[in-house]
């Protein structure tokens, strides 16, 4: 029973972190989209900011994938403990 509680807490923590990452990615995407539109229409845009946002967005994508994999592993372990 103790292991189930530990896994539940870990799953909840990872899920909250995943939601934070999704929120950050959403904010970044909006900013990237605005800069991308300026770039595509030939208007002046902050190239350094754009590249920085793209890099950070890719890092968040990798972190998001890792968290999803971790949550899936925890869920699998959780159900194995239940059985």
Indicate residue ranges for each PLM-predicted region:
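Short, charge/polar-rich alpha-helical segments
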Residues: 1-23
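Glycine-centered signal
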Residues: 6, 13, 34-35, 59
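Non-transmembrane coiled-coil alpha-helices
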Residues: 14, 25-28, 60, 67
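Short E/K-rich amphipathic alpha-helical oligomerization segments
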Residues: 19-55
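Short, flexible helical or helix-coil boundary motifs
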Residues: 36-39, 61, 78-81
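Short amphipathic alpha-helical coiled-coil/interface segments
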Residues: 53, 57-60, 64
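Long amphipathic alpha-helical coiled-coil segments
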Residues: 65-83
């Amino acid at each position: 029973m103790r292991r189930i509680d530990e896994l539940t807490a870990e799953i909840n923590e990872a899920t909250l972190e995943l939601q934070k990452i999704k929120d950050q990615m959403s904010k970044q995407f909006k900013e990237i989209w605005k800069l991308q539109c300026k770039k595509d229409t030939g208007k002046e845009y902050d190239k350094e900011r754009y590249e920085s946002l793209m890099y950070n967005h890719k890092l968040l994508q990798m972190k998001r994938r890792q968290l999803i994999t971790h949550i899936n592993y925890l869920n699998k372990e959780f159900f194995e403990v239940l059985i």
